[in-house]
Swiss-Prot record:
HAMAP family: Cytosol_peptidase_M17. The keyword Cytoplasm applies. It holds the Pfam family Peptidase_M17_N. Its EC number is 3.4.11.1, 3.4.11.10. This is Probable cytosol aminopeptidase. Presumably involved in the processing and regular turnover of intracellular proteins. Catalyzes the removal of unsubstituted N-terminal amino acids from various peptides. It comes from Synechococcus sp. (strain ATCC 27144 / PCC 6301 / SAUG 1402/1) (Anacystis nidulans).
Length: 486
């Protein structure tokens, strides 16, 4: 699938399928002057289609007809009243799915002129590419239906750089989707490390992988406590992108990487969704996806991508409820729930990131069911002691169409994590569980410019939503990239 930005006007374009994005104002009591010209050229087909289908131009609403002659199919897609970048993205996705159903080979898409044509071009590329993504690695009879092979963005000549960057971001999202969607017998700590090695070789990134013995030398008792029960070795991944010039800032992204979470001795029972615990490395997947995108884009920012990758399994040598672990900053943790293991692995990863001398740290993790209860499946939780960093992430998420909601770091809640035998317990009272999880992590990062994202809900969708097919969404990659580039 190739994208090309051209200056051609819709009335001059010829090809398989033409899509027009229309606002509600454009089809009010009378068609806009531009649409009237098209309607005259097409012998009234446009007005007839709008009237007969009762098309209202609601966001992502579509209607179609055959024109004949130089254009086989016409798609009208609604943009609503005042379209945002995310609206353009969703409208483009709706067009892509219609074009695929028509088996269109060439597609042209025209949206109204904008003050930010680069944003529109990027949104079209992202919306179409992400909507048409298919993961058929594990299908014995793959679905051969595909979308258009050639897509032209009308009226957007000169936006080649925006198209290229959007394609680079999409490549990162697709990597994250593939990692999250694959089962735990395919994606393991070992294969995650292999993926990091491939990224390093492909993109010229620096790579450091700490094996279990090195983790032990560094006092990473929290991550090693989780890893003990698995037959597969843990892999502590540290990828670094360094620009050729002096970086304008240095950042660290830390992703939780549990390739499977059985719950340990606090095993996940029936109805717990244990079969979906392959997704418990969604934070690490987004981290590696962001590494791919950043490595392709090559901004003037130094970025460290960190993920402690392991399984949380059950065996005779496994972590027991009641065990006390010592993290690499010397703080001790009473494990009162072996199924709250992600925060243990992140504890050592945050201490590691804290020692890199970066300007800001962001971690993301499929950390708590409590966050899903609070915010639902589509919204990630955000905690940060830094108002500036929180605002940066909120704006990055808004631009990406990835929803974030800031929640409080309510310090009095930390009392619920105090242990009579260690510094902290790894879980507190049931109420406010996502807040106490964030407070737990805060004990392992001294840096004041730090944020925690709980992405437990949006890394997976059971049904198709906009440009996300059912399954892994790749959530977080686009927000992280926007943040790094900001």
């Amino acid at each position: 699938m190739t994208f090309q930005a051209i200056a051609t006007h819709p009335q001059d374009w010829t090809g398989d399928t033409l899509a027009l994005g229309l606002t509600t104002a454009a089809i009010g009591e009378t068609l806009s002057s531009e649409l009237q010209k098209l309607d005259q050229q097409w012998n009234g087909v446009l007005q007839e289609l709008i009237s007969d289908s009762e098309f209202k131009a609601k966001l992502a609403e579509t209607t179609t007809t055959r024109i004949g002659g130089s254009i086989r199919k016409l798609i009208l897609v609604g943009l609503g009243e005042s379209p945002t970048t995310e609206d353009y993205r969703r409208a483009a996705a709706a067009v892509a799915k219609q074009a695929r159903s028509f088996k269109s080979q060439t597609l042209a898409i025209a949206f109204p002129p904008s003050d930010d044509p680069a944003a529109i071009a990027s949104a079209i590329v992202e919306g179409i590419s992400l909507a048409l993504y298919k993961d058929q690695r594990f299908k014995s009879e793959p679905d051969t239906a595909s979308g258009p092979s050639s897509i032209e963005l009308l009226g957007l000549a000169g936006q080649e750089a925006a198209i290229a960057r959007a394609e680079q971001v999409v490549a990162g999202v697709e990597l994250a989707r593939q990692l999250v969607a694959a089962p735990a017998n395919v994606v393991t700590p070992v294969t995650m490390a292999d993926t990091a090695q491939e990224l390093a070789a492909e993109l010229g990134l620096e790579l450091e992988i700490l094996e279990a013995d090195e983790c032990e030398k560094r006092g990473m008792g929290a991550v090693l406590g989780v890893a003990k029960a698995s037959d597969l070795p843990p892999k502590f991944i540290h990828l670094t992108y360094r620009p050729e010039s002096t970086p304008r800032r240095k950042l660290a992204i830390v992703g939780k990487g549990l390739t499977f979470d059985s719950g340990g001795y606090n095993i996940k029972g029936a109805g717990s969704g244990i079969e979906m615990m392959k997704t418990d490395m969604g934070g690490a997947a987004a981290t590696l996806g962001a590494a791919k995108a950043i490595g392709l884009i090559k901004p003037d920012v130094e970025v460290h991508f960190i993920s402690p990758v392991t399984e949380n399994m059950i065996s005779g040598r496994g972590m027991h409820p009641g065990d006390i672990l010592t993290a690499s900053n010397g703080k001790t943790i009473e494990v009162n729930n072996t199924d709250a293991e992600g925060r243990l692995t992140l504890a050592d990863a945050l201490v590691f990131a804290d020692g890199l001398g970066v300007d800001a740290i962001v971690d993301l993790a499929t950390l708590t069911g409590a966050c899903i209860i609070a915010l639902g499946d589509d919204i990630a939780g955000l905690w940060s002691p830094s108002d500036d960093l929180a605002e940066q992430l909120l704006q990055a998420g808004k631009a990406a169409g990835e929803k974030l909601w800031r929640l409080p770091l309510e310090e009095p809640y930390l009392d619920g994590l105090k242990s009579p035998v260690a510094d902290y317990k790894n879980t507190g009272p049931r109420a406010g569980g996502s807040i106490t999880a964030a407070l737990f992590l805060k004990q392992f990062v001294k840096h004041p410019v730090w944020a925690h994202l709980d992405v437990a809900g949006p890394v997976w969708s059971d049904k198709e939503k906009h440009y996300n097919p059912a399954g892994a969404t790749g959530y977080g990659v686009r927000t992280l990239v926007n943040w790094v580039l900001s």
